[in-house]
Curated annotation (Swiss-Prot):
Function: Transport of potassium into the cell. Likely operates as a K(+):H(+) symporter.
Subcellular location, record wording: Cell inner membrane
Species classification: Bacteria, Pseudomonadati, Pseudomonadota, Alphaproteobacteria, Hyphomicrobiales
Protein's recorded name: Probable potassium transport system protein Kup 3
Major localisation: membrane
Gene from which this protein is expressed: kup3
GO cellular component, one term: plasma membrane
Residues that span the membrane, as ranges: 42-62, 95-115, 129-149, 160-180, 206-226, 240-260, 282-302, 330-350, 360-380, 386-406, 411-431
Organism: Bradyrhizobium diazoefficiens (strain JCM 10833 / BCRC 13528 / IAM 13628 / NBRC 14792 / USDA 110)
Amino acid sequence: MTMGALGVVYGDIGTSPLYALKEAAKAAAHGATVTPDAVLGVASLILWALLLIISLKYALLILRADNRGEGGIVALLALLHARNAQPGTWRSHLLVVGLVGAALLYGDGAITPAISVLSAIEGLKVDAPSLAPAVVPVTVVILVGLFMMQKQGTGFIGRIFGPVMLAWFAVLAALGIHGIVKAPAVLAALSPLYAVEFLIHQDFHVSFAILGAAFLAVTGGEAMYADMGHFGRLPIRLAWFAICLPALVLNYFGQAALLITDPAMIENPFFQLCPDALHYPLVAFSAVATVIASQAIISGVFSLTQQSIQLGFLPRMQIRHTTSDAIGQIYVPLVNWLLAAATLGAVLSFGSSDALAGAYGIAVSLLMAITTLLAALVAIQWGYSPWLVVAVNGAFFVIDVIFFSANSIKLFEGGWFPLLLAALVAFMMLTWRSGVKLVEAARAKLRQPEEDLIETAVNKCSARLPGTAVFLASAPRGVPLALTQFVKHNRVLHERVLLVTVLIEESPHIPDEERAEVIEIIPGITRVILHYGFMQNPTIFDGLTLTCRQGKLPGIDLSDITYYVGRETIIPREDVPGMWVWREGLFAFLQRNAERSAAFFGVPTKQVVEFGTELEI
């Protein structure tokens, strides 16, 4: 598991040495020749950012806030029960903050592959400046190949991610030692005083520019928490403290040592650390490492999308499982191509890692601040002393805010790009969430109580059709609109009627023994509630198969079932209380293009009948 964590969790932060110290040193030089004191200050700042933010905050503190083993901002929202918060309550405001945090990951997901692969391919320019025009085209080719590969799954090549990244961290350490040996005075930067004194003696704007650039060294730290469910807390901590942290510190200090001895190397100190004979192999290896880092963030976005759909934060989309023997190997076509468009747009628009550095960091720093806040609320909910939580999380929150403020000065240098992407995603999430509530309220007005169904079954539908009918119900109460429509048009019921509702719980996984809740309304009419976790695939056919196997639905032949599914057409109306009509129009568009319920819940296509209903919101 530790090896797996190396390949998935630490790909992003592991490739930060390609650009982080370079950008921080350039900010410290602010157009002049970088001085040894500036280099020591930058190296010290990066070291203590890694220790405070990654080692202390994430590895030791945030990883404790798990939702039955799962991490990430969506898991935090589930722990805080924000999904069903009433409008106007503090939890409803918390939901908005949390969804903004989730949306920021999409902005990060577009920037990370762009800056990572660009920074690796830019190594070609070190020995051959004439190759500079090829950097962007080569980057585009690599990224197009990466996104095209997603539909095939990464099961096979994913197995080599860990060993490849282990070799990468070994190379980072070796390069760093090679540089430190030439200028051991760089080890003085181990003292935090160098970072503090250096920042104090700088102009305010320069200090913020340096902080914003140094923050690039810790981007990717959020993956430690987001991927906790895949690898576990202990392997993630072990990989960080035993392998990643030492290798990163050695490499950053090696680059700093190189700049102390030769400030002219500031354009690309990472590749200048390497002996000339190994330069091009290092460029190739860097490209492989950045592809692995990009794959990790793409897979993370797919996983976040799945969780958000399950919890009702995003419209249903087609989700393909790329392998049957590995949990979590999924492919979301729509998200893949939207992310590809955003990433390629970033590469073509900004054109270099230096330019993209301005766009990178602001979304991640805001996300880290939101994570710290939500984790503090979870700790208080779990019974920790509020004073202790405020003291500990408050200190980290101040650090997060400082870094976010420092990154905010890059807003017009490219920081707007990930924030714009995040704003669009957050707006869509909030619109979808509000629209779903309006639709459910409209359904509730039309939904008949169970008593009416009983009366209909006993007095008006004495004749029964052979076989079993399954009616999908959005709520575990009342009569589904599809059943009401069926009785209205046919004036008959089947011998067995199952009202099936899928409920997504705020836990990542629900065990099989707790999957089905079976309630007999009257003989022949049964309500079945299938419970799934937000990390599970909610398949109705599999759920009913399990329920029958458990003996809760005797006499049901699953091959002789007809599934009746309602499909609503949303009609925005200005005279009906709700959202602004243009937002209702957006919701109607999203709902119209969402994955159909039957397909999303894995209902056998040859056994489905759909009933249409118009709903005004």
